[in-house]
């Protein structure tokens, strides 16, 4: 049995390069993951400070203190010392502080703009998302967009807030996770090249912590009207368009007459429209669309909902919306009058490898507000709007837009050109062929976002109190800094 690598110590004077010397990549990752927020709070130096301190520690000051100690330790190794340098130069008055009490005291005096600057530097240092070496450590103690739905529902499952299971990247190449990761890049190219060719965009995001409270964090898939400043920090235009990307593995088909999905897709390709789209969706046993009659409660089974009876495939009984569902009713009212944009893409076999938009039409489909995708986008909107509000280098007027962009793909065949392009960008020859893109707008009613964020924040507080009972927490600042709806 292989020996477990020795965890690193945030407070030791040992160089991290020496600690990691001779270790495999996986063991290095395990050591870096041990530098988590939970391990920081459980460290003897932090516990001693908690026992002796006459103050009640609070967020986001504690998160900022952790960021300082973490990047003091890993900054040189990952080639990013800007986070630590900003603390020293702009928060600590030019002094490199070493003890918990002094660092926390300085962090508790930081204003929101300073915290925003730190969060932007952390985002820049963690680009490439889960492939980044400190990703596992940073997501500890954070309610991310993938955990937000669970936190709001306050379920007691294995998805922990503190000390979560590490992210694994050894996905089976033919499985849905690997499919989603490789096809996500294709959807980004479709959005940047075909839908937003003249708008500044960013294709690669790091981990965006909330500067207001330190308990929420997201990483975006794609956004238009976003640029970086001279220091490489993200700047979101108030009229930016943010996309959560999904790639539907269960709709992947082969271009063969015996494939029922292909037969339905062929009809959609030849005669684009709502009826052909419905046939395509219902070509599998568990479609991505659910018909829900007016005044009925949708299930949580999939992310698209239709009110119009033309989408009904087989009649099913639905529960009625009751006064207990007022928040759901609010969210439905804000989304049910919207429509999705459907883009049918050209077949590269017919266009010498060029993939472009063959047809575009509207479909009366809206987001299911009970589905986890809705909650993911809601949390993303909250963090993006914090960054916009705290960035002194951009105008304040504008209204960000949020979407779910869903890509549909088919398997490659021997007749497909080896070299396919989307605009001027080459398509990876090992990636499936994109066939369809559906863009669904997502809206949040006034007050609903605030209530849902408060529910998640309250759950975080209870979890922190249970996990770290020796800390005399002050949650008042946290409750006061859950963002309000605009």
Swiss-Prot record:
InterPro entries in UniProt: Herpes_alk_exo, Restrct_endonuc-II-like, Viral_alk_exo
GO terms (BP aspect): symbiont-mediated degradation of host mRNA; symbiont-mediated suppression of host gene expression
EC number of this enzyme: 3.1.-.-
Site residues (Required for function), renumbered to this chain: 184, 221, 244, 246
Gene3D superfamilies in alphabetical order: Herpesvirus alkaline exonuclease, N-terminal domain
UniProt KW keywords: Decay of host mRNAs by virus, Early protein, Endonuclease, Eukaryotic host gene expression shutoff by virus, Exonuclease, Host cytoplasm, Host gene expression shutoff by virus, Host mRNA suppression by virus, Host nucleus, Host-virus interaction, Hydrolase, Nuclease, RNA-binding
GO cellular component terms attached to this protein's record: host cell cytoplasm; host cell nucleus
Principal subcellular localisation of the protein: host cell
Effect in UniProt of substituting residue 246 to I: Complete loss of ability to deplete cellular mRNAs
Subcellular location: Host nucleus; Host cytoplasm
First-level EC class: hydrolase
Domain of life: Viruses
GO molecular function terms attached to this record: DNA binding; endonuclease activity; exonuclease activity; RNA binding
Effect of residue 184 to A: Complete loss of ability to deplete cellular mRNAs
Function: Plays a role in processing non linear or branched viral DNA intermediates in order to promote the production of mature packaged unit-length linear progeny viral DNA molecules. Exhibits endonuclease and exonuclease activities and accepts both double-stranded and single-stranded DNA as substrate. Exonuclease digestion of DNA is in the 5'-> 3' direction and the products are 5'-monophosphate nucleosides. Additionally, forms a recombinase with the major DNA-binding protein, which displays strand exchange activity.
Family assignment from sequence similarity: Belongs to the herpesviridae alkaline nuclease family.
Subunit structure: Forms a complex with the DNA polymerase, the DNA polymerase processivity factor, and the major DNA binding protein.
Cited HAMAP family: HSV_AN (MF_04009)
Name the record gives this protein: Shutoff alkaline exonuclease
Native source organism of the sequence: Human herpesvirus 8 type P (isolate GK18)
Source organism phylogeny: Viruses, Duplodnaviria, Heunggongvirae, Peploviricota, Herviviricetes
Protein's gene: ORF37
């Amino acid at each position: 049995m292989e020996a477990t690598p020795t965890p690193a110590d945030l407070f030791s004077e040992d160089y991290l390069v020496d600690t990691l010397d001779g270790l495999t990549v996986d063991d290095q990752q395990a050591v870096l993951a041990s530098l988590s927020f939970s391990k920081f709070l459980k460290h003897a130096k932090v516990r001693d400070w908690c026992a002796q301190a006459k103050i009640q520690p609070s967020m986001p000051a504690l998160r900022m203190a952790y960021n300082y100690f973490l990047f003091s330790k890993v900054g040189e190794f990952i080639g990013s010392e800007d986070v630590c340098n900003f603390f020293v130069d702009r928060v600590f008055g030019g002094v490199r502080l070493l003890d918990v009490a002094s660092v926390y005291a300085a962090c508790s005096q930081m204003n929101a703009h300073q915290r925003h600057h730190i969060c932007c530097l952390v985002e820049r240092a963690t680009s490439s998302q889960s492939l980044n070496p400190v990703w596992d450590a940073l997501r500890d103690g954070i309610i991310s967009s993938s955990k937000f739905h669970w936190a709001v529902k306050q379920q007691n499952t294995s998805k922990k807030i503190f000390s979560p299971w590490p992210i694994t990247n050894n996905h089976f190449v033919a499985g849905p996770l690997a499919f989603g990761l490789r096809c996500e890049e294709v959807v980004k190219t479709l959005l940047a090249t075909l839908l937003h060719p003249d708008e500044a965009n960013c294709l690669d995001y790091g981990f965006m912590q909330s500067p207001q409270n330190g308990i929420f964090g997201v990483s975006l898939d794609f956004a238009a009207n976003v640029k970086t400043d001279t220091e490489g920090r993200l700047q979101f235009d108030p009229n930016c368009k943010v996309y959560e990307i999904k790639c539907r593995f269960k709709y992947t088909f082969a271009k063969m007459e015996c494939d029922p999905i292909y037969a339905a897709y062929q009809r959609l390709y030849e005669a684009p429209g709502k009826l052909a789209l419905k046939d395509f969706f219902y070509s599998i046993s568990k479609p991505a669309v659910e018909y829900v009659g007016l005044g009925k409660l949708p299930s949580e089974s999939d992310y698209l909902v239709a009110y119009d009876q033309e989408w009904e495939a087989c009649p099913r009984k639905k529960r009625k919306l009751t006064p207990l569902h007022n928040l759901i009713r609010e969210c439905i009212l804000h989304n049910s009058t919207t429509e999705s944009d459907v883009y049918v893409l050209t077949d590269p076999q017919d266009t010498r490898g060029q993939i472009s938009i063959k047809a575009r039409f509207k479909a009366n489909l809206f987001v299911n507000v009970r589905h986890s995708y809705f909650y993911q986008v809601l949390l993303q909107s909250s963090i993006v709007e914090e960054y916009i509000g705290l960035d002194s280098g951009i105008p304040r007027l504008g209204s960000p837009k949020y979407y779910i962009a869903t890509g549909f793909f088919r398997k490659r065949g021997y007749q497909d050109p080896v070299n396919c392009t989307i605009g001027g960008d080459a398509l990876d020859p090992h990636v499936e062929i994109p066939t369809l893109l559906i863009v669904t707008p997502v809206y949040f009613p006034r007050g609903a976002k605030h209530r849902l964020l408060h529910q998640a924040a309250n759950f975080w507080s209870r979890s922190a109190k249970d996990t770290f009972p020796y800390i005399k927490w002050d949650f008042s600042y946290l409750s006061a800094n859950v963002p309000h709806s605009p």
